[in-house]
């Protein structure tokens, strides 16, 4: 064994990114320097590595091993090394232990170089990956290797000296705390009707090209605005896990996050369609491991899994290659456990455990709006609610295309603050009556009752291309709820909101009192006081401001819009309204 160690060590300086996490997990303390942990890990690795057999056969990304006589054995879910050359190794994960002694291995690295007859060494270590602040702002793969932005090859550099075990259990009941603090997405329809709390698991489900990824990425971007208003130690950390996506999609999302300054708080984990099925299977667990590092230190983390349908397909592929018995839709019998042990790791910890949280936003793709499919029903039963995106609403121009009737949040108003709760409570009743009246009047004359008038304007306010500020959403919905938009035509509702929430334009609407309002409306504490009985003066000023704004809007804008007749003016108006819709 010493002879093997000296022979292998000479060529492994560039390959220690994988060996170090595996071996140093049990010995390296948190926060140890990279140099010291690397050297000690190499020594520990070669002392504990033992040859256990040879590669017998290879089937895709699965290798079958024949144990050598007198081998010390190998444990399930541990890492093995296959010697593909005198100085190069391929990594694998023990995934099947058969009665005849054969061992099924998921290959994760250097797959094309693995051949029958090559020696296999056991490390005796579970998979560990780098975690901590060092992974923020980077694109990594499930093994913790940084991926260049071009996504052509992956480097072997160890990102951080702190390591986290990928396969861990979920926090127990005693360690958890009730979900009672909101995580704002920036979309009015979600934050009012389907609120998400920190520590919750909210499924995003819908057909292809209905905006599922858009909602998840926009939620990450919205956290940047919130992080800028709070202390850095309370900033929300985001982990975006891409499973089975095209490399171009991952690069596009990376550029989008970079343009909004979100990479400072975000890690992108990429297990693209070009990666082995084993890495696509491991990606969500590696992502939540990075999130748990921050949760255990009292921080708040958002994990997006895009999407779990492709992880289930990768797991099915692995199981079939390992000759495991297929079940419904050829998935193995433990596919439910595949997702439950992942999503149960999302939690809000109790104050005694630091008070940190991991919020999970899994994405699942449906086929022809079928929410009764196997994987879809499994994940729905695990999560605390779902946001259902409708193809008809999407093709009709609604953004986000949230079907409020089929969407639900089991946390409810307990994850909303006083301001949002005061608006959302009445809003739900109006929208429910609006949907009922709209369904009854299909093909006939619609009776213009208050629920019909305000419901149509609420739907217009819910249509937004990008996240909006929390305080702007509250004021807009409050104006609609109290009848200030009743006389505003539906096609001009977004223009009304645009002028209302922009300070530079809003100041043009009148008095010094309005100017004062726009100065302090940006303060969250003031906004919450609008909807309490503790500050009737501020509440009255808000009412007066909305009254003046509506009067001047109807007088100076809507009347002029109705008088427009020339094609040039109509085109200019359409461009103006389109730009306003995109802005809010």
Curated annotation (Swiss-Prot):
Localization of this protein: Mitochondrion; Mitochondrion inner membrane
SUPFAM superfamilies named among the record's database cross-references: C-terminal domain of alpha and beta subunits of F1 ATP synthase, P-loop containing nucleoside triphosphate hydrolases
Positions that bind ATP: 207-214, 464
Record-linked PROSITE patterns: ATPASE_ALPHA_BETA
Transit peptide: 1-24
Organism from which the protein derives: Trypanosoma brucei brucei
Site-annotated residues for Cleavage: 159-160
Matches recorded under Pfam families: ATP-synt_ab, ATP-synt_ab_C
Gene Ontology, cellular component aspect: mitochondrial inner membrane; proton-transporting ATP synthase complex
Site, as annotated: Required for activity: 407
Quaternary structure (record): F-type ATPases have 2 components, F(1) - the catalytic core - and F(o) - the membrane proton channel. F(1) has five subunits: alpha(3), beta(3), gamma(1), delta(1), epsilon(1), plus the additional subunit P18 (Tb427.05.1710) that is not present in F(1)F(o) ATP synthase from metazoa. Subunit P18 (Tb927.5.1710) interacts with the alpha subunit with a 1:1 stoichiometry; the interaction is direct. Subunit gamma is part of the central stalk. F(o) has three main subunits: a, b and c.
Origin superkingdom: Eukaryota
CDD domains linked to this entry: F1-ATPase_alpha_CD (cd01132)
Tagged with keyword Cell division: no
Name by which UniProt lists this protein: ATP synthase subunit alpha, mitochondrial
Mutant phenotype after disruption: RNAi-mediated knockdown of the protein in procyclic, insect stage cells impairs assembly of the F(1) component and slows the proliferation rate of procyclic cells that are cultivated in vitro, both in the presence and in the absence of glucose in the growth medium. ATP synthesis by oxidative phosphorylation is dramatically reduced in procyclic cells.
Family: Belongs to the ATPase alpha/beta chains family.
Mitochondrion in keyword set: yes
InterPro entries according to UniProt: ATP_synth_asu_C, ATP_synth_F1_a_nt-bd_dom, ATP_synth_F1_asu, ATPase_a/bsu_AS, ATPase_F1/V1/A1_a/bsu_nucl-bd, P-loop_NTPase
GO terms of molecular function: ADP binding; ATP binding; proton-transporting ATP synthase activity, rotational mechanism
Function: Mitochondrial membrane ATP synthase (F(1)F(o) ATP synthase) produces ATP from ADP in the presence of a proton gradient across the membrane which is generated by electron transport complexes of the respiratory chain. F-type ATPases consist of two structural domains, F(1) - containing the extramembraneous catalytic core, and F(o) - containing the membrane proton channel, linked together by a central stalk and a peripheral stalk. During catalysis, ATP synthesis in the catalytic domain of F(1) is coupled via a rotary mechanism of the central stalk subunits to proton translocation.
